[in-house]
Amino acid sequence: KNSETDCIALCDVDDTVLKERSENVKDITGKKPKIYKDYRKLLDNKDIDAVVIGTPDHWHCLNLVDALSADKHIYCEKPISNSIEEADIMLKASLEAKKCVQVGQWQRSGGQYKEAMDYLWSGKIGKVRLVKVWAYMGWYGWVDNFKDTDAPKGVDYSMWLGPAPLRKFNQNRFHGSFRWYWDYAGGLMTDWGVHEIDIALWGMNAKNPLSISAAGGKFAYPNQDTETPDSLQTIYEYKDFTMLWEHANGIDGGNYGLSEGIAFIGSKGTIVVNRTGWEVIPEKDHRNGCLLYTS
């Protein structure tokens, strides 16, 4: 899409993915990229100015620090890391390297979010007392249990594990479903929550909460071998408002009839925004029946 950008190299531990994606690049650009199975060798390529890190979450810290050491600009997929300690290491490396580093909170690029934020900041819905944030993902439901096996042919499983604990290969812990295991990720909260909570914090200009409390578990699918909660509620306490995150795997019945979104609940109305658009739900003055906000 950008004529000033060339995709000259790809790296993946899976030969099947490398073959498919390199063909995709060739179909789009007319040029076949150089392929690597070890990202460190890709970083040695002096013709590369910038890299996109789209590895499983447990690899982000090492990938980013090594890319900065190789003098590359970086776009790193969310979540930035799996721990505060890793994030601190990545921030320090980014500040010292003085390269361009962006984390994939791309949801902010949706025009509806900026429109909703401008309306929120106008004060028309009054004092915000509660922000609700949610993701109900029906398509993230039951996962069949599989026995451990040898890794598929063409997969460098040792490199895939990287800094994660050594264990036998299991189909459920590989590719997209790695998200449901603590060794590699944090479940639906770190997959969808980082997007939705980012919008909530942006709207409220909020940073560190005073306290956080959470409750949840594997309530819907207790017998499958995944580890992260399929149901979760988390309360973030701030000085003059609270934020509530909630998620559920396997069902779509979220707040306001939406499977995902953010709601800013004010004294005069509520702003609800998600990837499909935004709306304002007005409150009434029950003394005279009038709406409490103006468009």
What are these regions (language model features)?
Residues 18, 59, 75, 88, ...:
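Tryptophan-centric aromatic hotspots in well-structured domains and transmembrane helices
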Residues 293-294:
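Conserved small/polar residues in nucleotide/adenosyl-binding loops
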Residues 7-11, 52-53, 75-76, 82, ...:
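Structural recognition of the beta-strand scaffold that forms the well-ordered cores
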Residues 158-241, 251-255:
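Rossmann-like dinucleotide-binding domain that binds NAD(P)(H)
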Residues 1-76, 82-100:
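N-terminal glycine-/serine-/threonine-rich beta1-alpha1-beta2 phosphate-ribose binding loop
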